[in-house]
C-alpha cells in the first residue's frame, strides 16, 4: 500500500507536513506534485490515477479549502472521495464509505489536526457489510 499525495500551490506547505508525518511513521509515500506548480485539478487527477493503479493505495490532496479537489475526485469513475476537516470523518470515511481519497483545505486545517485526520484515514479499515450497499450505489452512478 502506498499513500499518494499531491497539492496545488495553496496546499504545498501542509502537504510537506503530512508527507513528513507519513514518512516518520514508515508509510510508503508517493508525492505526485513534488517540485511542480500545478492546479488542484491536475494534482487531483494525478493522485487519483496512482490510487487507482493498485488496490490498497490511498490518496490525499490538499488545496486551499479542499472543496475543489473533492469535486474533481468525485468526477472520476470508480473513485470514492471525501472532503474532511476533522479526525472522526477521516476515520469513518474509510470504515463506512470505503473512500480511497481524502481532500483537505490548508486554510481550514492546521498542522496537528491534519496529521490526526491522516492518521485516522490511513489506519481506518473498510467495514463492508451493510455499508457495501451504499458503496455499490455510488459505483453504479459512474
From Swiss-Prot:
GO biological process: D-allose catabolic process; galactose catabolic process; lactose catabolic process via tagatose-6-phosphate; pentose-phosphate shunt, non-oxidative branch
Keywords attached to this entry: Isomerase, Lactose metabolism
EC number(s) reported in the record: 5.3.1.26
Pathway participation: Carbohydrate metabolism; D-galactose 6-phosphate degradation; D-tagatose 6-phosphate from D-galactose 6-phosphate: step 1/1
Reactions the enzyme catalyzes: aldehydo-D-galactose 6-phosphate = keto-D-tagatose 6-phosphate
InterPro entries noted in UniProt: LacA, RpiB_LacA_LacB, RpiB_LacA_LacB_sf
Gene Ontology MF term list: galactose-6-phosphate isomerase activity; ribose-5-phosphate isomerase activity
SUPFAM superfamilies referenced in this protein's UniProt entry, alphabetically: Ribose/Galactose isomerase RpiB/AlsB
Residues spanning the membrane: none
Record keyword Transmembrane present: no
Complex formation: Heteromultimeric protein consisting of LacA and LacB.
Entry similarity comment: Belongs to the LacAB/RpiB family.
Protein name: Galactose-6-phosphate isomerase subunit LacA
Gene (name only): lacA
Amino acid at each position: 500500500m502506498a499513500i499518494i499525495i499531491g497539492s496545488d500551490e495553496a496546499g504545498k506547505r501542509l502537504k510537506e507536513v503530512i508527507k513528513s508525518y507519513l514518512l516518520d511513521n514508515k508509510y510508503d509515500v508517493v508525492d505526485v506534485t513534488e517540485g511542480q506548480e500545478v492546479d488542484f485539478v491536475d494534482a487531483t487527477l494525478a493522485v487519483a490515477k496512482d490510487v487507482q493503479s493498485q488496490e490498497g493505495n490511498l490518496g490525499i490532496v490538499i488545496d486551499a479549502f479542499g472543496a475543489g479537489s473533492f469535486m474533481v475526485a468525485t468526477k472520476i469513475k470508480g473513485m470514492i472521495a471525501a472532503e474532511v476537516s476533522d479526525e472522526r470523518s477521516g476515520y469513518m470515511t474509510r470504515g463506512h464509505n470505503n473512500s480511497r481519497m481524502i481532500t483537505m483545505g490548508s486554510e481550514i486545517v492546521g498542522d496537528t489536526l491534519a496529521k490526526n485526520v491522516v492518521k485516522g484515514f490511513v489506519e481506518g479499515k473498510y467495514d463492508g457489510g451493510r455499508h457495501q450497499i451504499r458503496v455499490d450505489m455510488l459505483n453504479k452512478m459512474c
